[in-house]
Structures are given as C-alpha cells and as structure tokens.
Amino acid sequence: MSDRIDRDVINALIAGHFADPFSVLGMHKTTAGLEVRALLPDATDVWVIEPKTGRKLAKLECLDSRGFFSGVIPRRKNFFRYQLAVVWHGQQNLIDDPYRFGPLIQEMDAWLLSEGTHLRPYETLGAHADTMDGVTGTRFSVWAPNARRVSVVGQFNYWDGRRHPMRLRKESGIWELFIPGAHNGQLYKYEMIDANGNLRLKSDPYAFEAQMRPETASLICGLPEKVVQTEERKKANQFDAPISIYEVHLGSWRRHTDNNFWLSYRELADQLVPYAKWMGFTHLELLPINEHPFDGSWGYQPTGLYAPTRRFGTRDDFRYFIDAAHAAGLNVILDWVPGHFPTDDFALAEFDGTNLYEHSDPREGYHQDWNTLIYNYGRREVSNFLVGNALYWIERFGIDALRVDAVASMIYRDYSRKEGEWIPNEFGGRENLEAIEFLRNTNRILGEQVSGAVTMAEESTDFPGVSRPQDMGGLGFWYKWNLGWMHDTLDYMKLDPIYRQYHHDKLTFGMLYNYTENFVLPLSHDEVVHGKKSILDRMPGDAWQKFANLRAYYGWMWAFPGKKLLFMGNEFAQGREWNHDASLDWHLLEGGDNWHHGVQRLVRDLNLTYRHHKAMHELDFDPYGFEWLVVDDKERSVLIFVRRDKEGNEIIVASNFTPVPRHDYRFGINQPGKWREILNTDSIHYHGSNAGNGGTVHSDEIASHGRQHSLSLTLPPLATIWLVREAE
C-alpha cells in the first residue's frame, strides 16, 4: 500500500509544505478499489464507516507514525459518503472527512472574483456556516494566490496547520476547504507558507467578527440578514432634507464612572440614541467601528474591515444599536477607510508573502504620515474587496451613508510627498487614476444597488467635481465636506473683534464657490485635537465673550447653506480638547444652570428650528435659496442674508460679530410685512445679554440697500438672529 504514495509526498504533507492536499487525501479510485487516505496527527486507529449503518468498511493502515493513514475498500468503484472512526488517546471519535467534498466556489463566482466584478464577494469568501451533503460545518475561502500552502487553524483543530490544508483554485488564486463540525463562535486563522517560504498566521480579511485587541483571531460568524431600507431613511439623506449630523466616537462619548470602561453597543443604544434624538440631530456619524488594534488610531487604521469592533460588544449588539437609531428616526453614517491599512503582520500587509493588497513600491504603497500601507486600487481583487465592503455595511447593517476618509490622500500620488518620493501616473500627472476610478466605481455601484444610501467625501483640496455625477467628470459622491469654509470661519472667529473688519472676506468667500459642490459644513473631531484647542477655547475674550462668540458662530453655521456636522462635546461647549481615552466632560452640565447649558439649549433649538423651516435646508445647493442683504459692512462686522425655500418663503439671518450692540440698524429687504424673531443667540435662555427686538418688528417703506422696503433692527452683541415673515 505504501507504494501508492511517494514517501516525499507524505513527508511534505506532514511538514505542511504540500500545496495540493486533495490529490492525496480523501477517497481515490485505484485498480484495487477505492482508497481512503487521511492525515490525522496523534491518531492510533482509523476505520472507514458506513454512516447509515455504522458498519466498519475498512481499517486504515498507519503508513507514518506522524499520522498518515491509508486503506482500500475492495470491490467499490463509485464514490460514496463515508465517515472516519478515529481513536485519539484511547477515545473513539466519529468525524466527517473534509477531503471527501468537492470544490466549494462555483465557476461563475470564481470568474467574477478574478474579474473584480463580484458585487458581494463577502458572500463567497471568508468563513460561512453551511451544510454540505447533509453534514454541518463551515466553508472557508481566502484569496492568497502566491502562497505555497494555506491551512485553516482554530479551536476545532488545536491550531495545528497540518490538519486542514486547503485546496487551491488556481484559476482564481483562492484557497478553500469545508470543515465539518466547525461552527459559529469558534476562533480561527489562516496558517500559510508564503511565497518566500515563511510561515505566517493571518486573520481573515473577510471575517465578520474578530477578537478584541490585543488578540487577533477571527470568529466564525453567520452573515447578517439584510436590512430593508425605508422610504423615511431615504428621504432623510436627500439634498433638500434637513441634515444635522452628530459625530461620535463611541469609546469616549460617555464611560462608566467607576472604572472608566466603555459603554457597550446596547448601553449606547439606550443612552446615546435618545440623547441625539432629544438634541434634534437627524444623523449619527460614527468614527470607524471596524476592528482595529490601536485605540489611538480612533479606528482609522482598521485591520478587520468587515468586523465591528468587539470593544463594545458583538456583531449582533452593533445591529441592535443601529436598529435603535433607526427606530428613533436617526440615520446612521459610518466613517469608512478605504485609503490605507496598518502594517500589522497578522492582517493584510504582505498577505501571502507578496504585496498583495498594497503596492510593492513604497512610493506608491506606503503612507509616510501614518506609517500605513496604501491599497493597490488597480488590482481588481483589491478593488472588489473594498467595493463589496461598502455594500456590506449598507445592506447587512442598514448603514445609511458612508463618509469616506482622507480622499485627497487617495487621489493624489504626491499627497504629503516631496519631489522624488512619488511616481507620476501613465500620463505624467500627479493624480492616482486607479484610485479615482475606484471611487467612481464604488459610488456608481452604491447608486445602482442601494437607492437612498449616500456617500460623503472628506476631501481637503479643490479637486473638481467631487460631488458631481460620473458622467459629468465627477467622482460621484453625494456630499463633500467643506473644509475651506471650516478653516476660514474658525480663523475669523478666533480674531479679536477689533481686527475682524480686516478679515471680513473669510465669512463671505465661501459663497463664491458654494454651488460647485454639495457641501457639508463640518466641525469635526479633527478640529479639537493635537493642540488646536476646543472650539470654545478658540474664541477670543473673557468667558462671557467666548460663549457669546461661540453661540453667534453656531447661529451663523446653522443658517449658512450646507448640511451641518458637529462633533460630540461641542454641543455643550466642552472646554478642553477631545481625549479618546476618557469620557466627555458631562460634569460641566452638573450643579445648576450655566453657560454650558445655554449652548446645549441653543444647539437643540438650532436643530429644531432648522428642521422646521424649509427655507433653512430645502435649497442648500440652489442659488435661489440664498441672497445677501448686507455683505459689505466690514467696519461693523455685520452680515445679513436671507434663506429661501422653493415657494419663495424667506428667513432673514443677521450676525453682529462685535461686542457692540447695533441699534436701529437698517437694511433693505425683499418682502415687506411683520417679521418675528425666531432665534436669538443672545437670548437669556442661552445665558446671553437678552438684547433683541421684542419678538416682532414691522418693515418700513424706506429704501435701503437698493430695495424699496427695509427693516430697522437691534443687532445684539456677538450674536446671530433669525427672523421669519408672519402671514398677513
């Protein structure tokens, strides 16, 4: 019998260096009958069993004391279902042979994966509990075309790479194996001999759950059921909808006071969700929740792109959180990081011993700012991995929007690089053509497959058409963060009011390009870290003036065209920078009514008023929705404009960015009549000085600013007021 199997083959198989285990193991036809071969380290006796009757058909001979067995079942010509009775340490176990099952991946799936056009690669790759030929187990598939051998190791096989070597599908570079008995909740990894002969242990790129750091194994976990998208959630993302986003880092929004430990997904569902709803926000934006090894990356260096982090609970717990947000009327935005990944050796880096997911040349594949690796978007399987991930979060978790991080670093080859540190594209330019095509393709597929879900770009340059359709030469995003507006307005607000007259254009310049993109106005986490100070602490003056400046700024921001985004803590004017290792300073809201309560009430009222009046959001991206009334009064740092809805209804917004009240300030208006003050950031309700206009004011038929009718208002110090025209 030993003549049938070459000794070198047995040695290679046992040593874990044999790349084609199915050519040796399992059931094979021979002239003497059907031969069954098995590699079962530490076994002492093995029989082939008839499953229905339990009858022993043949005892396998031990050809190698390290666990290689073989035996012939005479007079049998056709393959049949069998089991193995194996004696380990004196105990008999009945097992199904993984090597009796045929190929797992269908030819069409293999072709689509190789072409990079499989819309949902996660349905094929990764670990999936399944039943094959009446046997329950898990099918594993991993793309590692340059590996010499790949095995599944885990809790079901003592983490022994000899026991379950996989089949290579050469046409696609995918290794596959069905392991009977492996089930949900068990840990696993892929052990491989890489292209260079080195032994590697890798987490599954397509794992749906993973261990919490510092452990790095993947978990067998069923594919989540699809989430049905509702019409209400679709409408909440549209261009004419009120969108006010509360940006949250789940690990530091609030912590347990006794041990500074995180809240769980379910605790966040019970605390964060009702708070955001009460505050009037329409959307929750989550900093990346993909599994990541380093807390200090805030999730922006993910190693488990398909796995919600276990820091706050299980995959099902995260689904519970999303469901709770939807039940409260909140859409959920997920920060998504397809731009780079960390160098940790258990993850994607040099996955099969080659630069499989990343570029081989560090001038293309290494991000020196973050010590991370850059995806090779030109490789079809890599692009497919990422596009499929976008669909996965939207379809399987009900994520309503993806905010794509660091788009500029993706689309420019020379991003943060000096001359000689980057490689031009094929036309000699600086654009990363493959990344641009990847983004366009992702946005196109999402638009086709999940109507109503949207994408938002954090893009820090003036790359044209980020939020324009692909057929117009754009990238196809629905929205783009307006970082220029954010920088200009914060630069203005930090100035002593006496100097603001010399920088008046920082508040007006944004309208010159406002309709080139569909903008979100962001005051994000990036603006309250790394020595930039908190938003409150950037405001000039004493404590009263700091809070007044902040309130005036928020009133301006909520009225300015564009959707709104505010990072957690800013809604109650946290005074210190954000610390990801600690809770927000909720104690500032303790001990009686104070300035922080005032800002919190203002943000709530801004949200509710903004949502109630269509003029404040319906035409954000249409020039008809905005008109300057006073734009050139730089000496007094006064700016006045109107917001307008589709029916022509107007809201007047007036800001005074000096501490000097402006009494009897007259300006021309479009619509005469009685105007009611609906919001005043200087109200005593917000701990202001309570200057204002007594509720209502009537227009005069006095020409001003080129208009026949005008209003005469009191403009409170360091304040913004909103007025709506009363019906006759």
UniProtKB/Swiss-Prot annotation:
The active site is at 405 (nucleophile), 458 (proton donor). InterPro entries: A-amylase/branching_C, Branching_enzy, GlgB, GlgB_N, GlgB_N_E_set_prok, Glyco_hydro_13_cat_dom, Glyco_hydro_13_N, Glyco_hydro_b. It catalyses: Transfers a segment of a (1->4)-alpha-D-glucan chain to a primary hydroxy group in a similar glucan chain. Its EC number is 2.4.1.18. GO terms for biological process: glycogen biosynthetic process. PANTHER family: 1,4-ALPHA-GLUCAN-BRANCHING ENZYME. Belongs to the glycosyl hydrolase 13 family. GlgB subfamily. This is 1,4-alpha-glucan branching enzyme GlgB. It comes from Shigella flexneri.
